[in-house]
């Protein structure tokens, strides 16, 4: 009896110690991350999802997360996690609209046609339930595995799904259906090229006023620490050419390729040049009511961070003010930083950002396997 009591006691003490250690570790992480006065950072999910990438949510606070592995996930607002799928190929892109969930893989897009029904089945099931889904569209195959993930976003006003098809190479003249952004009609499934000359966009969003598509683009590697700039662009007309591989940034010539550009091609310059190699992924216009008024419609940028620069840059979330009438960008500022340590090591890499139902923002971190929540408390 005495031994049983001692065993139970030591198990309890061990459990308390582990919980305390996890809590302390989480507090150390969030205290390291710096945000403007009045904002707070918390870990929303910690090491429970492998390589979280794309993130979306419904009006009830349910969250849907893609990944750089083979899994896609559903998370309740109470932070209980369920599996949507287990065997997809790099399902980094995911978006919810009108009770449907669209999920990308490297060569397909899937659709879950009744999300509420699948949510109920997941919650009621006592076993590992995977959701019923269908193939929505086939995508061009990527044979190199470079830039093979497909970011997606629903254009609800035009009833279209927007999809990136990145270049299979660091820099090379691409075939017609590569280094482009596509649109797919949600009803007819008709495809149309939205933009040419986009090396690899892993983030786009629709301006809340104009509904025009703004997107990030990652510049090529191998030209040095400070060129080419990464980019923020805006699409004003379909089928415009944004330069890759012939020009970059505000139409700076990419020597070795510029002379090979198709004759009479008009290149659209970026509206903002980000520092080279910060690797902008998800971008998001804030649409909530929790942040101060000056943040409404502000563009948030998830800078994933450099990997081949002598001094690392990025690893943070930045913001830009976008004028929807003039299509200009200004006031580039750091909003959240701290993932990059003084010794140049890092413990997190931001990927994708959304406004959550309560007015906070959530962002994914595929390096630390975490979801973070940033909210505002009045000072």
From Swiss-Prot:
One of its GO terms (cellular component) is membrane. InterPro entries: 6-blade_b-propeller_TolB-like (IPR011042), Glc/Sorbosone_DH (IPR012938), Quinoprot_gluc/sorb_DH_b-prop (IPR011041). Pfam families: GSDH. It comes from the Bacteria. Keywords: Membrane, Transmembrane, Transmembrane helix. The chain crosses the membrane at residues 9-26. SUPFAM superfamilies: Soluble quinoprotein glucose dehydrogenase. It is found in: Membrane. It is a single-pass membrane protein. To A.liquefaciens L-sorbosone dehydrogenase. This is Uncharacterized protein BB_0024. It comes from Borreliella burgdorferi (strain ATCC 35210 / DSM 4680 / CIP 102532 / B31) (Borrelia burgdorferi).
